[in-house]
Amino acid sequence: MAGISVLVLLGLLAACVVVVVLLLQFLARASLGVGGDDPLLREGLGQVRRRFGGCLVAALLIMIGGVVLNGLLPGWLGIPLTLAPGLAASVALLGFAVWPTAPQVGTGSTSASLIRRSAWSFGSRRLFAVPATVAAVYLGALATAAVVASPDDAGLMRAFAQTQGNLSSSATPFPGSFYGLPLAAMTIVVVVSAYAALRRMASSASILSSATEDLLRIDQQWRRIVTSIIVRISAAALLGYLGVTLVYAGSAMHRASDFTVNGGSATSWSAVGWVAAIAGLVSVLATAVLSGAAIAAVLSLRDQAVRPSGVPVGQSR
């Protein structure tokens, strides 16, 4: 198992570096706009803010329900609380995707653009790479945890055990398949929900009522703003899951390896546990930053009515 622990440690460090680099680029580039004011865009974004606000309230109620249900069902060993954040994020994203289109702003006449739009039309590759990379790293972490997990006293794969000679130790909870399978399924649900929200945003009717060149630019600007918010919400949910899972996994690894043989640590898994726990705490902190940025962006949507300087229509900064 020593060789496996070294591989896990190297993989964990490499994954952390990739995620941190992408996250820093994301935070540096995900500005919602620059200076100026446009009444039409301001009014349209106010309508979008109400959509997002309602979805975030629904997500908060889901979180509260998960906490309450977790207390009422202790025999479920934390599964309701484990799934609540992902379910809340998915409800917020899917709620935005299915919410009726906001009424148009303007003269009352309608128009349509012949430009074909997809879910990826209003963001850069680096923007979308953040949640995609976090999801891939998280699924890889869950798969690795499932391989090294051990059964607990009830036979559930939610423990981490170590044996050295006549000594043995185990610790729970550990994200083996008991937690890993539901978490992997929830990760896929969050990704699909984010895609649905992005596709809805890209394909929905304009919040403006005509298609002059100037209003077309405004329409594409609000779509870029909403894309940034959707990506922030999904990235925060996935990064939060990754962080909390690493903290619990690292804690279990360290506690199960916290005995000595001939004056030294029993296994190298103790070091892996420390690294995983620290990486998890950093991820949780980054989640708080992303979540705060997403909520602040929603609350200030009307103030994001901007005229981008020197940015061609259809391109992001």
Describe the residue ranges of each PLM region.
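N-terminal membrane-targeting/anchoring modules of bacterial envelope and secretion proteins
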Residues: 1-152
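Membrane interfacial helix motifs at helix-loop boundaries and amphipathic/re-entrant anchors
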Residues: 1-12, 64-86, 144-184, 246-281
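Transmembrane alpha-helical segments in integral membrane proteins
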Residues: 14-29, 97-100, 181-209, 235-243, ...
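Juxtamembrane inter-helical linkers in multi-pass membrane proteins
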Residues: 35-38, 106-117, 200-223, 304-314
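Short membrane-interface loop/juxtamembrane segments of multi-pass integral membrane proteins
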Residues: 39-45, 109-124, 163-170, 214-230
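Alpha-helical transmembrane segments of multi-pass integral membrane proteins
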Residues: 121-150, 179-195, 231-243
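Intrinsically disordered, low-complexity segments enriched in Gly and acidic/Ser/Thr residues
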Residues: 196-287
